[in-house]
C-alpha cells in the first residue's frame, strides 16, 4: 500500500531535469487507488523546495533517512547536535575541504577557498543555502552533511578526526555523503510503515 520513489535519476530525469507526465499520471493513479506515495531522497528537506511540486505525494523522506514527513506532519527529524556540527565544519575547513551542511529548513556551505566546482554547483542547485559561514557561526538544524575534497585537501586528517558516529559514503571524485550512524533511506521507510 505504500510506494517510495527517489527524485534524482528516478522521477527527475538527469538529462532533462523534468518529471515525465507518465510518472506524474502513475503517481496520481496509485494515490486514487488508495496507495500512499512518498518521495524518498538523500536530499535534505531544506533542499527539495525546487522539486516539491513535481507531483502530489503523501509525504517526503529526506536526508538519507534522517527526516520523514507524512500528510503534512513531521514524524522523524534526527538532528545533529550544534556543537558537533560546528566541530565537524571547523575540521573540514581546517583540512581544506568544503562542507555542505543539510537541514530541514536551510542548508549551510562552509569553505576556506570556494575553489571546488561541485560546491559551486551544489549552492546553485539547492535554493535555500546560506553561504560562506565561519564554522562556529552555524547555529541551525542539520540532519547530515557532504564533504567536497580535492588534491589540496587533507583527507587523511579529515577522516582520522571525524566523529565515529558518522557514516561516510564515498560518492566518488572527492565527494562524501555523511550521515549519523544507523540512518539510511530504509530507516525512514520503516518509520512510515510503522506509522501506517
What positions do the PLM features span?
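A short, flexible beta-alpha/helix-coil linker loop
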Residues: 10-11, 67-68, 173-175
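Active-site phosphate-binding/coordination module
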Residues: 21-116
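Residue-level marker of alpha-helix boundaries and capping positions
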Residues: 17-18, 39, 79, 148, ...
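Conserved residues at the C-terminal ends of beta-strands
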Residues: 6, 63, 148
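Conserved acidic, metal-coordinating active-site core of Asp-based
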Residues: 95-98, 102-196
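Pocket-edge positions in alpha/beta enzyme catalytic cores
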Residues: 11, 15, 77, 177-181
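Asp-based phosphoryl-transfer active-site loop
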Residues: 1-16, 88
Amino acid at each position: 500500500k505504500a510506494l517510495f520513489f527517489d527524485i534524482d535519476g528516478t522521477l527527475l530525469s538527469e538529462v532533462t531535469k523534468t518529471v515525465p507526465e507518465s510518472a506524474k499520471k502513475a503517481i496520481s493513479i496509485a494515490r486514487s487507488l488508495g496507495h500512499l506515495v512518498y518521495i524518498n531522497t538523500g536530499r535534505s528537506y531544506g533542499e527539495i523546495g525546487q522539486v516539491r511540486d513535481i507531483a502530489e505525494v503523501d509525504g517526503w523522506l529526506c536526508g538519507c533517512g534522517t527526516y520523514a514527513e507524512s500528510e503534512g506532519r513531521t514524524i522523524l527529524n534526527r538532528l545533529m547536535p550544534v556543537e558537533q556540527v560546528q566541530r565537524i565544519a571547523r575540521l573540514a575547513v581546517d583540512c581544506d575541504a568544503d562542507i555542505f551542511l543539510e537541514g530541514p529548513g536551510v542548508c549551510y556551505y562552509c569553505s576556506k577557498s570556494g575553489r571546488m566546482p561541485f560546491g559551486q554547483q551544489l549552492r546553485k542547485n539547492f535554493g535555500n543555502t546560506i553561504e560562506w559561514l565561519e564554522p562556529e557561526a552555524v547555529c541551525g538544524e542539520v540532519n547530515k552533511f557532504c564533504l567536497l575534497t580535492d588534491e589540496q585537501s587533507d583527507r587523511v586528517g579529515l577522516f582520522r578526526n571525524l566523529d565515529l558516529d558518522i557514516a561516510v559514503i564515498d560518492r566518488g571524485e572527492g565527494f562524501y555523503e555523511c550521515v549519523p550512524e544507523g540512518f539510511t533511506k530504509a530507516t525512514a521507510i520503516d518509520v512510515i510503515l510503522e506509522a501506517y
